[in-house]
Amino acid sequence: MLRKMTIEDYEALFAMWSNTPNMGLRSLDDSKEGISRFLERNPNTNFVAYEGEILVGAVLSGHDGRRGYIYHTVVLPEYRRRGIASSLVDMAVEALRQEGITRVCLNVTEANEEGKKFWLEKGWEKKDFLGFYSKAITDKENRQLFRVQP
C-alpha cells in the first residue's frame, strides 16, 4: 500500500534509513523533530510503501516554492526491483508538479552505485557542470552525522 507519509511512520522510517548503505543522516535534520517540521512544511510530497505492517519503502521530498528536492529514497533490499521506488518517486514528482514546481533536484552519494543507476534509468540527468556547496548554520553538535553506512 502506498500512501502519504506521516510522523507516525518515523520510527520504522528511521530504522530503515539507518540500515541502508550510503545513507547519510544528520542528527538535527533527520531527527523526529526535524522530520516533523519538514512534513508540516511539505505535507503532500512525501510517501511510504507498506507490505502489510512492514514499511518497505519511502521517499522524502519537498520544495522551497521554486525547486523541488528529493532528499531520501529507499526501499528494503528484499523488496527492490518490484517498481516500488519508481512508484514512490512518480508520486512525489506528481505532487510537486501539482504544487507548481517545474524542476526537481536530488543528490546521490558517489559511493551509491545502485542509486546512481536507478536515477539514470528513470531519466534523471547528472549535472557534471554543477558543484555542490554546503554550509552548516547551526552549532557543531547538531551537525553531526547519525551514521553513514559504507
Q: Can you annotate each of these PLM segments?
A:
Residues 75, 81-94, 121:
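Conserved acetyl-CoA-binding loop-helix of GNAT-fold acetyltransferases
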Residues 6, 76, 80, 109:
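Residue-level recognition of the GNAT/N-acetyltransferase active site
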Residues 114-127, 132:
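Short acidic, glycine/proline-enriched helix-loop-strand junctions
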Residues 4-72, 95, 99, 127, ...:
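Acetyl-CoA-dependent GNAT
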Residues 106-115, 134-137:
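Conserved beta-strand-loop-alpha-helix junction that forms the acyl-donor binding cleft
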Residues 96-108:
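Conserved GNAT acetyl-CoA-binding A-motif
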Residues 139-143:
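Short helix-loop capping/hinge motifs at secondary-structure junctions, enriched
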